[in-house]
Amino acid sequence: MRSHYCGELSEAHLDQSVTLCGWVNRRRDHGGVIFIDLRDREGLIQLVFDPEYSPESFRHAEQIRSEYVLQVKGRVQHRPEGTENPDLKTGQVEVLGQELILLNASETPPFPVDEKLEVGEDIRLRYRYIDLRRPESLQRLRFRSAIIRQLRKFLDERGFLDIDTPILTQSTPEGARDFLVPSRTHPGQFFALPQSPQLFKQLLMVAGVDRYYQVVRCFRDEDLRADRQPEFTQLDIEASFLHEETLMALMEEMFKELFATVLEVPLHTPFVRMPYAEALACFGLDKPDLRIPLRLVEVGDLMKTVDFKVFAQPAQDRDGRVAALRLPGGGKLSRKEIEEYTQFVAIYGAKGLAYIKVVERSRGREGLQSPILKFLPDEVIGAMLERTEAENGDIVFFGADKASIVNESLGALRVKLGHDHGLVEHGWSPLWVIDFPMFEWDEDDHRWHALHHPFTSPKEEDLSLLEQNPGACRSRAYDLVLNGTEVGGGSIRISQSQVQSQVFRLLGIGDEEAQDKFGFLLDALKYGCPPHGGIAFGLDRLVMLMTGSASIREVIPFPKTQTAACPLTGAPGQVAEAQLRELGIGVRRLASDKV
């Protein structure tokens, strides 16, 4: 139906006859000549309909409105001198219309496609097929496609096999809640949609596939949180006979090539390696943004004997922490601004936000401003200023509480201060976080949970700690963090059946339950399982970062809302009683439900 895309025409096509198809972006009537901007996936081209050149096509053009779908035949010509549009890829040429065919009319869309207006997300998602006509929305999908194409190319060239794994699988007791699918042929039993292909890709390693990858949909019925999707896309990777350093180096090469090809931006390798403990100590969280030149500083040892319980008690508590965060030039902050930051850290459980302003450091206590100075001896103040490297004009904030609260609150404050005060450096700052603990203790459940997942291998030198001191056992896990966002996580896996059973028992999964839920894996590990490991990257989040999008929903073709609903289709919805009876399911309806 067409010979060219609208957006690919240039002076190289002058005097050629072309056939174009697309949507009317805008129609203008200027002095008896009609101009139509025709839009397709590749861009815009200006069409000219002159009654003296083609009276019939001019009459048709008079009836055309925005978003009508057209087929147009015409001749490419230079735009008249002075009417060129340097902001448009096709701005040097136009098409003189010879024949116009209306392929389909359009009602007035719920929002304009051709204008950069702020449109509410609810209506954009409800009419997502209109929203995706907007150049910026369509460009994100093109970019997403380019990223996936480049990643596939890299892995294909290095011997990785693209292999599908099942979507209908077994529900497992670890991780987020599963989406369950009732089985009609096995009444009362359920499949689960996969949270990841984890177990199947490990079985592929047992099978001798050696190198596997897959661009795969994953499903997690998580509690509602901002910027989370119940279904998302992963680049899933697994390989045999390698150590973590080999895999990390390969992934660095993949990202370096991706950024060079798609963004034309260099990434310097090797990426920074940072132990988990260092990340928490210096940045308060396990996904630090290294573009922000602010660090947390431990001062608990200085505060153990001060006559100020707010500091002394957590400093003496085994699970407590007292940390400082210096903001260069922050001495100019007003009382109102400090109060706003105090309210901000309260979101993370902090009971307050102590501070000291450094006016003239050389004067000691007299050169400082703070309501807490009266509680601190001169030697503590001096040591704190020395350790934080505070200078005149700075402000030093303090967090004192359980270590988890201090880390989370000051870690979040560090990021906010960096953005509020223009301290975030431009560019890309990738790093690996390594040496994670194998387990974390759940105070509510009074049991251990796997920090990553139960199939992660402990470090060989820490194997004995599985029985002696699980909290001190480190894993062979690694997370890739990019500008403060975790984009991927992986590990070397457990390849011995007895170690896997030991980890299950430690997590409260008894032998009977382990056999019921994971028996196929435990059996497979007994049949010559190779050492293996892998990683999975969240493609949606990676595309969001690389496109500079504000939300993950911007880079997913048909996303769900924050309430895990689809405004476009109305999902989730009720189903007919006959379908439920066929599945052997009864539904207890709420009084508010529609019947």
UniProtKB/Swiss-Prot annotation:
An annotated GO cellular component: cytoplasm
Keywords: Aminoacyl-tRNA synthetase, ATP-binding, Cytoplasm, Ligase, Nucleotide-binding, Protein biosynthesis
Aminoacyl-tRNA synthetase recorded as keyword: yes
Residues the record marks as site: Important for tRNA non-discrimination: H30, G82
Cross-referenced SUPFAM superfamilies: Class II aaRS and biotin synthetases, GAD domain-like, Nucleic acid-binding proteins
Subcellular location: Cytoplasm
Catalytic activity: tRNA(Asx) + L-aspartate + ATP = L-aspartyl-tRNA(Asx) + AMP + diphosphate
Stretches the record annotates as Aspartate: 198-201
EC number: 6.1.1.23
Molecular function, one GO term: aspartate-tRNA ligase activity
GO biological process: aspartyl-tRNA aminoacylation
Binding site for ATP: R220, D221, E222, Q229, E486, G538, L539, D540, R541
Chief location category: cytoplasm
Subunit relationships: Homodimer.
Protein family according to the UniProt entry: Belongs to the class-II aminoacyl-tRNA synthetase family. Type 1 subfamily.
UniProt function note: Aspartyl-tRNA synthetase with relaxed tRNA specificity since it is able to aspartylate not only its cognate tRNA(Asp) but also tRNA(Asn). Reaction proceeds in two steps: L-aspartate is first activated by ATP to form Asp-AMP and then transferred to the acceptor end of tRNA(Asp/Asn).
Listed name of the protein: Aspartate--tRNA(Asp/Asn) ligase
Organism: Nitrosococcus oceani (strain ATCC 19707 / BCRC 17464 / JCM 30415 / NCIMB 11848 / C-107)
